[in-house]
Amino acid sequence: MSPITPVPAAAARPVPAGPAMPETRPVESVQSAPGGAPSRSRTMRALVKHHAGPGLRLDAARPVPVPGPRDVLIRVRLAGICGTDRHIWEWDQWAASRIPVGIVTGHEFVGVVEEVGSAVRRVTPGQRVSAEGHITAWNDYNSRTGNAHIARDTMILGVDRDGCFAEYVVVPEENVWPLHPGIPDHVAAVLDPLGNAVHTVMAAGVSARSVLITGTGIIGLMAVTVARAAGAAQVLATDLDPRRRALALELGADEVFDPAGPGWIEQVRARTRGDGADVLLEMSGSSAAIDQGFSALRMGGTAALLGIPSRPITFDLNNHVIFKGATVLGINGRRMFETWYQMESLLLSGRLRLDPIVTHRVAMSDFARGFELMISGEGIKVVMEVS
């Protein structure tokens, strides 16, 4: 992995008023889930953003978080490494301006409920669960009108508060998602990015329509199999990496294109009555890919944008949106909790193919190798075995 020049940390940003942060003081050992499990230690292993620069550190004596009355303490089994974690690892401009030094990172996981607060009623110790990583107090306008995924007071697990790259994590009861026994652990550990793909595909209404996916990273690849399962008439995809293009074909894409090559937009039009794709799912955040994707979108088409550019971009609004009459959707996170029900239904239907995407499992002690696999492109989705 090539060295990365650290970006100076920005001034501390204000923390939005929202859900209370769990305490992390040492606690007396308590009994784990029923069944004779051993008592829990007062400390745990956790991956911490230990300084304002590249990398993470394994802290072997982090205090176990203490659940509040409406919180759930979860023992983490597997945790997924995602693009946000890579930003934090590399300490790019976004991470330096957003991530508090000392935080436990990570937000994708599967685990078992260890302990619940006194006011928790919906989950019990011993349940296998995942969780929605966007946490809100459910008080603002968006939360109260069905759009909690874009609430003003949202705090993100592993970004604004301690996350799941640890033996234990605390989340509010409302965010806990009990898992169907038909969903295996390695899939349950990556429901967060799968939810991004499902939200994007479902928002765009792909059934019986031609779909172009620009960028087949982890979520773009998931979008290929989700779009196919959701009834897309044709799925086309682009990526610079030939390995990812090949995997997109394996997951159900009808054709893939190298966006650096000539003539591929004309090929998309040739496959779509000469008009262009009905739907664009932009997953890359690349300025060039965004421009090309809108060029390949038909007049009156729908574009759903999930990819996040690393900096502001120049965009031909006149020709790509106004004169084209395009519908443009900004996609953020997962709809809480409509997307989770859709994910569960799709997974249990057997129509999603995710096993080829989850390529590596590493021990948490070998976390540096996990990040290297992801950054090099050798790994697609890497999950860590935490406990």
Question: Where do the language-model regions lie?
Answer:
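Mid-domain Rossmann-like dinucleotide-binding core that forms the NAD(H)/NADP(H) cofactor-binding site
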Residues: 181-262, 266
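NAD(P)H dinucleotide-binding glycine-rich loop of Rossmann-like/cofactor-binding domains
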Residues: 98, 135-214
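Glycine-rich beta-strand-centered segment in the early N-terminal region that forms part
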Residues: 64-79, 93-141, 180-182
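Residues located in well-ordered beta-strands
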Residues: 45, 75, 110-112, 234, ...
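C-terminal capping/lid region of NAD(P)-dependent oxidoreductase domains
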Residues: 2-3, 7, 18, 22-44, ...
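Glycine-rich cofactor phosphate-binding loops and adjacent beta1-alpha1 units
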Residues: 204-207, 250-327, 368
